[in-house]
Amino acid sequence: MSSHGNSLFLRESGQRLGRVGWLQRLQESLQQRALRTRLRLQTMTLEHVLRFLRRNAFILLTVSAVVIGVSLAFALRPYQLTYRQIKYFSFPGELLMRMLQMLVLPLIVSSLVTGMASLDNKATGRMGMRAAVYYMVTTIIAVFIGILMVTIIHPGKGSKEGLHREGRIETIPTADAFMDLIRNMFPPNLVEACFKQFKTQYSTRVVTRTMVRTENGSEPGASMPPPFSVENGTSFLENVTRALGTLQEMLSFEETVPVPGSANGINALGLVVFSVAFGLVIGGMKHKGRVLRDFFDSLNEAIMRLVGIIIWYAPVGILFLIAGKILEMEDMAVLGGQLGMYTLTVIVGLFLHAGIVLPLIYFLVTHRNPFPFIGGMLQALITAMGTSSSSATLPITFRCLEEGLGVDRRITRFVLPVGATVNMDGTALYEALAAIFIAQVNNYELNLGQITTISITATAASVGAAGIPQAGLVTMVIVLTSVGLPTEDITLIIAVDWFLDRLRTMTNVLGDSIGAAVIEHLSQRELELQEAELTLPSLGKPYKSLMAQEKGASRGRGGNESAM
């Protein structure tokens, strides 16, 4: 077929799009895409291949690192390395985690302050409402999928006697856990919030109470005859003797009481609340807040340039992180049997949410193909799998969305830090599913009210799960306590949590990224008004000019892709 015939075919099929049904339009769109792909392959040259490799170098290196890391780990497992040797082997991966965590604190503060300051209160309120609705809807859907999967597959049938326990889980009263969540939203010391979180500790104290009893068993305080009574003929000495017969018994017992305490780690929730409020105040100061806006915008730009340097080391770190985790696992057989069914259930649930629900939401809102978008997030997703922390992945997520996919920086600066802190779809799904699995292995039948309680508690607890490794295990105590399930049974699933934690972190990061794209699409009107009215300096340049440059760069990248 000649190029003229190909063009004629494309033009005629385009005219028919308005007359045929959506199914036929989809079929013709796929045919056009296949034809364009065939034409690109026919005209491909070595220069095109090199350009593709340069443009996708990060992704190719990261995927290769995962494959090499898994292969290397299984090749070294027969040598049975000691724990010390494994730690030495994993050291390059530890360095990557430390580099990324180093950037999280200034990135959260600078991006949120700049994002809030660049929008007026009305626009911020609308975007915040859209973000809250998106977070709530996706989290509820994730919890529903988790409950549905564990109910259908029923991985907990059988007995828990065959399951191996690992570690210990600290029991935390539900009320104290939620109060700690609220306390952490308002840290009394911002400097301390950079490295500590409030956490209720528990101590025991001895309580002593006096119990008064009488020899004849009468109640304390019962009426006694006066010291001397002529009527009953008793003497003063006799009455004193009777009074001495009253016994005082001292009872002592231990009582557990909550006391203020702390835990190491960034109080991300408190910093998010402060940064949002501080950014809104700076935005309301108009011209007077210009210096502060310049400062935080320059800080954000400097952090992103550091990310651009560290990102080249990411494939090496991911390789050793994944290989080290596989080497640490003593018995790979725990992935089979009853825990194997549990693992499969979690994987199926996460796949349904991340592979079907989130892309469907993206398609319904934006009317665009979600899979090229997910492909653009591939490096952030692989980094999430390697680091097992949505907060540590945040710098890479910013880079993928802003530079790779061209999402508006005013949206990413607002949505991503908040999402990495409170939007945990994968964690919510996992907690609901794991709670019902523990009920199943205990042969405990849950009624509709208890399942509803698990749904609500898992949704709320996922907000309190900071973006740190295995935080879901801690918040799951809240879910189990809410329906009276034994919290010590969490140790039954710790053996596979290192693997599932990586998958749910990938789901969390994808949910935040799609949320940014969805909110950007819904907020186009507010963004255009802000672009016309507001000038936000960025390294001495007007924000409007910066946005124009970014759009031009995005069009340039799109042109290069079409050339392929």
From Swiss-Prot:
Tissue specificity remark: Brain, mainly in the cerebellum. Expressed densely and selectively in cell bodies of Purkinje cells.
Glycosylated residues (UniProt): N216, N232, N239
Annotated localization: Cell membrane
Residues that bind Na(+) 1: G419, N423, N508, D512
Function text: Sodium-dependent, high-affinity amino acid transporter that mediates the uptake of L-glutamate and also L-aspartate and D-aspartate. Functions as a symporter that transports one amino acid molecule together with two or three Na(+) ions and one proton, in parallel with the counter-transport of one K(+) ion. Mediates Cl(-) flux that is not coupled to amino acid transport; this avoids the accumulation of negative charges due to aspartate and Na(+) symport.
Keyword Transmembrane: yes
Binding locations of L-aspartate: S388, S389, S390, T427, I468, P469, Q470, A471, G472, D501, N508
GO molecular function: glutamate:sodium symporter activity; high-affinity L-glutamate transmembrane transporter activity; L-aspartate transmembrane transporter activity; L-glutamate transmembrane transporter activity; metal ion binding; neutral L-amino acid transmembrane transporter activity
UniProt: Na(+) 2 binding residues: T421
Protein name from the UniProt record: Excitatory amino acid transporter 4
Membrane topology recorded in Swiss-Prot or TrEMBL: Multi-pass membrane protein
Keyword Signal set for record: no
